[in-house]
From Swiss-Prot:
Residue ranges annotated for the S1-like domain, each copy included: 1-72
MF terms (GO), sorted A to Z: ribosome binding; rRNA binding; translation initiation factor activity
Database matches in PANTHER family: TRANSLATION INITIATION FACTOR IF-1, CHLOROPLASTIC
Function per UniProt: One of the essential components for the initiation of protein synthesis. Stabilizes the binding of IF-2 and IF-3 on the 30S subunit to which N-formylmethionyl-tRNA(fMet) subsequently binds. Helps modulate mRNA selection, yielding the 30S pre-initiation complex (PIC). Upon addition of the 50S ribosomal subunit IF-1, IF-2 and IF-3 are released leaving the mature 70S translation initiation complex.
Pfam families to which the protein is assigned, alphabetical: eIF-1a
Main location: cytoplasm
Subunit structure: Component of the 30S ribosomal translation pre-initiation complex which assembles on the 30S ribosome in the order IF-2 and IF-3, IF-1 and N-formylmethionyl-tRNA(fMet); mRNA recruitment can occur at any time during PIC assembly.
Subcellular location: Cytoplasm
Source species: Shewanella baltica (strain OS155 / ATCC BAA-1091)
Lineage of the species this protein comes from: Bacteria, Pseudomonadati, Pseudomonadota, Gammaproteobacteria, Alteromonadales
Name listed for the protein in its UniProt record: Translation initiation factor IF-1
């Protein structure tokens, strides 16, 4: 899959789930399940409830995503 196919949206962490999964509420009100991208995992980026994040979604499954950035 090409990088251009991903949809990037802003959201807020609602809940922390097992296995570094998170429930994220997007700006448009949808709630998705997201995991941390590999680079964030490698650099030990901590994500807590209430953090503002950028989530990448694929057009094929809009209920799952990947967290690629945590705002300060």
């Amino acid at each position: 899959m090409a990088k251009e196919d991903n949809i990037e949206m802003q959201g807020t962490i609602l809940e922390t789930l097992p296995n570094t999964m998170f429930r994220v509420e997007l700006e448009n009100g949808h709630v998705v399940i997201a995991h941390i991208s590999g680079k964030m995992r490698k650099n030990y980026i901590r994500i807590l409830t209430g953090d503002k994040v950028t989530v990448q979604l694929t057009p094929y499954d809009l209920t799952k995503g990947r967290i690629v950035f945590r705002a300060r």
